[in-house]
Amino acid sequence: MTETPTAQPDRAADADTPQHRYTAELAGQIEGAWQQTWAVEGTFNVPNPVGELAPPDGTVPADKMFVQDMFPYPSGEGLHVGHPLGYIATDVYARYYRMTGRNVLHALGFDAFGLPAEQYAVQTGTHPRTRTEANIVNFRRQLGRLGLGHDTRRSFSTTDVDFYTWTQWIFLQIYNAWFDRDANRARPIAELIGEFESGVRTLDDGRPWSELSAGERADVVDSYRLVYRADSMVNWCPGLGTVLANEEVTADGRSDRGNFPVFRKRLRQWMMRITAYSDRLLEDLEVLDWPDKVKTMQRNWIGRSTGASVQFGTDAGDIEVFTTRPDTLFGATYLVLAPEHPLVEQLAAEQWPDDVDGRWTFGATTPREAVAAYRASIAAKSDLERQENKTKTGAFLGAYATNPANGQQVPIFIADYVLIGYGTGAIMAVPGHDQRDWEFAHEFGLPVVEVISGGDISEAAYAGDGLLVNSDYLDGLDVAAAKAAITDRLVADGRGRARVEYKLRDWLFARQRYWGEPFPIVYDSDGRPHPLPESALPVELPDVPDYSPVLFDPDDADSEPNPPLNKATDWVHVELDLGDGLQTYTRDTNVMPQWAGSSWYELRYTDPLNKEALCAKENEAYWMGPRPAEHGPDDPGGVDLYVGGVEHAVLHLLYSRFWHKVLYDLGHVSSREPYRRLVNQGYIQAFAYTDSRGSYVPAAEVVERDGKFWFEGAEVFQEFGKIGKSLKNSVSPDEICDNYGADTLRVYEMSMGPLEASRPWATKDVVGAHRFLQRVWRLVVDEQSGAVRVANHEALDTDTLRALHRTVAGVSEDYAALRNNTAAAKLIEYTNHLTKEGVTARAAIEPLVLMVAPLAPHLAEELWRRLGHDTSLAHGPFPVADPQYLVTDTVEYPVQVNGKVRSRITVDADAGKDTLEAAALADEKVQAFLNGATPKKVIVVPGRLVNLVV
């Protein structure tokens, strides 16, 4: 081990401060010295089975642990104290398991493509890479100060060419694959072509494959691919000059960045066929150790429902409707199409019927004018806004359809509450038993028919169960029997079939931006796309004169995208030989969405230096492969622990699961899921202040006088919210590190409450964590002389032995369960015992130093060295409890919230106030009842109860 620079005492303190006290200045010196040692010695570097990171003899420990954080976007503002919460928690977890002997992989990269850097480039002319790399340098500096035990050799940015080469490679694997529904998995597209050529698979129209032209064959193959082009309804933002994903559009139909209007329009875009995996994405949720809330969110997003597909006949052809309630078909009194439905133009009549109701016309003189006017009126509405509870609007098409149940003619409308992206984009409206249909019917004077008994449909739609009425041969049946009977009749009549439908839509996978991964796709002179061969990767981003797409009047809904890459004309036009001789091709000028890199980055951590493959199969299998002996027979494999915010519960996690499953099907990975275990950390919250206009003011400049708050002489008003830039209440971790030291920041954040719960930040309370570390320091170091004050041969009394081993057992369990707040409480309690009893025995103090190490690693390393050890404690040993000292009486405490018992906890009979408080706050029932709220006060009555005042 290299020699660690000796940390110097704080000589800047006042004359009354002991020379060798653990102060912020001394903490800074210790932390800098140990961070340098860790870097020089590669303390946290972990070996791979094969490749550049493999040891000379190729042996790696069988007992591994892969810990991963959701990597950050490197913004220009840097970190605030809310950002490190999850990073510190995973570091504590990784350090604990590393000390128990596991081979722990823990690294952190950067999710660096995206709109913010591009917008900065547009404003300043600075290349996005320049800004991004500067931000990453600052992030690494700030994260480095926290003492995170990362294997820095494995760090990367999604903007690194060596990284996005493999993002493009994965795109090609997905593009060159199709989903075999019989086998329920993806297969290489070459196997599909082979089946057509051999006759194993035939065309729907019966033509022999050999009779098709090259173009016709390509069209057939393209229709099967997992990546395809389609004319899709997209969120077009003229003010930004780009298409936006749904998550980038606010609830009121404006862009999340810039607040520009967003319009729904049809454009040809790249799509990924994630819907092919709907059932597997649902089914495999059962084998994941994820929060129930996240699983529920994914289930709802996928939205599997069973029902029937029903054909309503019209003069323009059949309208297909999907319904989960075919039993109510006799109550369908009108149809509603999404305004974007492809049959709208054919169905819209030239003139209104003579007896048309004026409410149906949308104020237009003809149905076709009504369609145009209605579409224009909703163009700027988001899908969410279209489904809000409000006065129903719509327009009659001047056309009718035939209800296949009773032969009645029902009018056809368009309305915004029907979305083209769900089902077939058409609904049969049953106003007697669907509230939205009931409201529409009452707005437009349409008939309401009761077909399920048991409710009063004059007041509202009845959505409950009952027996069928007014339904011919279904009368008297219950709902389940009626569903089966009507479906059988529809099948027999050729007017329908049983069907499963999903809310999940295929993934829009293109953006009209500059700062993203280029597509490895070129187009021939006929506009047909061709994938580049793997040998042509990477397709690097070219320089362009400026980085902005062509911007339009924000209200110009008819404008068309013109991506920035079109400006790189020398790059766009390229001569290639793709098997038919040298030809001129045109590159695709869209870029991939920001989700692309995060959809597979866990794999690159396992083999970041590999230039020949995404990752070696041996390395992926070691770090992520299934381990049924440890996790059970259904173990899907994946990262052992993934920690991040619940805001990524659906999209990022769903996309990464999809990509991983395709790679699994194609034989590139052994794990069928990317993340075996997921934990969502809470938010750090803080007070924010608004002036009389409701604008936020800098919280750091607000002063309190006589119970009121003032900013620049004017009264402001206090509120509580998520800490961050928008609320102007950010606190930099640099500030806390400067004033107290990084270990104090780590201990404070981990002590604030359960990891999953949100917690209030209070800088004034940080000193409590610092004082705890000072007490630990004083157990080893004499503050006056700096000498080690530990006695080597002092025997431990029974009380101390019991306190020690109970602490070891409890802290071990807490670290393993990510209960860092209760671990800290136990360590504080044990430290107080040693201090109060004047214990100086090495046998009592060395285990404390080892147990403190995951929380406060710099301090622990320094004390370990001063205790005479010449190796780092980063690899242990972590203390092991002696069972003979764990036998103890326990006490059950009722836990009250505002005076009412909500749960009960069992603790050691001699548990102190801090342990009781931490255990109460960590209780699952209490957490569920608090629902993220922070108690104003915690009352502990020893031997009786704990009461949380909210």
UniProtKB/Swiss-Prot annotation:
Molecular-function GO terms, alphabetical: aminoacyl-tRNA deacylase activity; ATP binding; leucine-tRNA ligase activity
The entry's keywords: Aminoacyl-tRNA synthetase, ATP-binding, Cytoplasm, Ligase, Nucleotide-binding, Protein biosynthesis
Cellular compartment(s): Cytoplasm
Residues engaged in binding ATP: K725
InterPro entries: aa-tRNA-synth_I_CS, Leu-tRNA-ligase, Leu_tRNA-synth_edit, M/V/L/I-tRNA-synth_anticd-bd, Methionyl/Leucyl_tRNA_Synth, Rossmann-like_a/b/a_fold, tRNAsynth_Ia_anticodon-bd, Val/Leu/Ile-tRNA-synth_edit
EC number(s) per entry: 6.1.1.4
Pfam families to which the protein is assigned, alphabetical: Anticodon_1, tRNA-synt_1_2, tRNA-synt_1g
An annotated GO cellular component: cytosol
SUPFAM superfamilies in alphabetical order: Anticodon-binding domain of a subclass of class I aminoacyl-tRNA synthetases, Nucleotidylyl transferase, ValRS/IleRS/LeuRS editing domain
Principal place of residence: cytoplasm
Motif ('HIGH' region): 72-83
GO biological process assignments: leucyl-tRNA aminoacylation
Catalytic activity: tRNA(Leu) + L-leucine + ATP = L-leucyl-tRNA(Leu) + AMP + diphosphate
Superkingdom of the source species: Bacteria
CDD domains: Anticodon_Ia_Leu_BEm
Annotated motif 'KMSKS' region, positions: 722-726
PANTHER family: LEUCINE--TRNA LIGASE, MITOCHONDRIAL, LEUCYL-TRNA SYNTHETASE
Family: Belongs to the class-I aminoacyl-tRNA synthetase family.
NCBIfam families: leuS_bact
Name of protein: Leucine--tRNA ligase
Organism: Mycobacterium sp. (strain JLS)
Top-level taxonomy: Bacteria, Bacillati, Actinomycetota, Actinomycetes, Mycobacteriales
